[in-house]
Amino acid sequence: MRAPRCLVVLLVALLLSACSQQLYSGLTENDANDMLEVLLHAGVDASKVTPDDGKTWAVNAPHDQVSYSLEVLRAHGLPHERHANLGEMFKKDGLISTPTEERVRFIYGVSQQLSQTLSNIDGVISADVEIVLPNNDPLSTSVKPSSAAVFIKFRVGSDLTSLVPNIKTLVMHSVEGLTYENVSVTLVPGGAESDAQFTASAPPRPSPWPWLAGCALALCLAGAAALYWWPNPQAGRWGGWQRLRELKKGKAG
């Protein structure tokens, strides 16, 4: 009985793999949910699967919508860029860092956390924060001020101009010695104006009847193969055609 079962499993796997294609893998569940929501709103028959009981996730889309799906995700800044946090930057690795290395890692960690925070604002596709903390000489009379530059790419139709003062205040209070005037914010539009634009330009889905016909044909082939290789207890071997003769004799009788 193993041969028919293996054949059926193989046919089902081939049919499933032919229906969809993997877009991204190794995702967190939150990223997978965000991507799935965006794709569904854009008219894509997407799905998410996990190969390892929820540790990582993958997002799939129909073959005929792969290119369109990637365009939609790219316009929405998905999957989200992963930013390191201070805990990861200063995790114990058994090595002793120099004060200069510690300073660089701290500045980088703060900029990464700020970038992650700003990326969570509605309408933001991506955000990057660059921080400059001069290493001032304590014996010098001139002090170089700290500065920060914020770059935000946002979706067209999102009004982030009113949030610029709040963004500058957030960055100022996150960096020691930084003043409000030394924080610059650059806003750049990108992506689509709305999901309605993508929905209107979504490629038409083909009729499902060819797939249903293919599934029916595959099931018929699997049934015929199972019948052919059905075991014959009397002969002690696989007796497919002999089994057919027995069935015909039974009907005639």
UniProtKB/Swiss-Prot annotation:
Matches recorded under PROSITE patterns: PROKAR_LIPOPROTEIN
GO biological process: protein secretion; symbiont-mediated perturbation of host programmed cell death
Topological category with respect to the lipid bilayer: Lipid-anchor
UniProt KW Phosphoprotein keyword: no
InterPro entries with a match to the protein in the record: AMP-bd_C_sf (IPR045851), FliF_N_dom (IPR006182), T3SS_SctJ (IPR003282), YscJ/FliF (IPR043427)
N-palmitoyl cysteine lipid attachment residues: 19
Cellular-component GO terms for this entry: cell outer membrane
Subcellular localization(s) per the UniProt record: Cell outer membrane
Cystine pairs: none
Signal sequence, renumbered to the chain: 1-18
Keyword flag Metal-binding: no
Keywords on record: Cell outer membrane, Hypersensitive response elicitation, Lipoprotein, Membrane, Palmitate, Protein transport, Signal, Transport, Virulence
Predominant place of localization: membrane
Lipid attachment in record (S-diacylglycerol cysteine): 19
Similarity remark: Belongs to the YscJ lipoprotein family.
NCBIfam families according to UniProt: III_secr_YscJ
Annotated function: Necessary for both basic pathogenicity and the induction of the hypersensitive response in resistant plants. Could be a part of a specific transport apparatus or a secretion apparatus that is required for pathogenicity. Hrp proteins may form a complex (tunnel/pore) that enables the export of molecules such as virulence and avirulence factors.
Full protein name: Protein hrpB3
Organismal lineage: Bacteria, Pseudomonadati, Pseudomonadota, Gammaproteobacteria, Lysobacterales
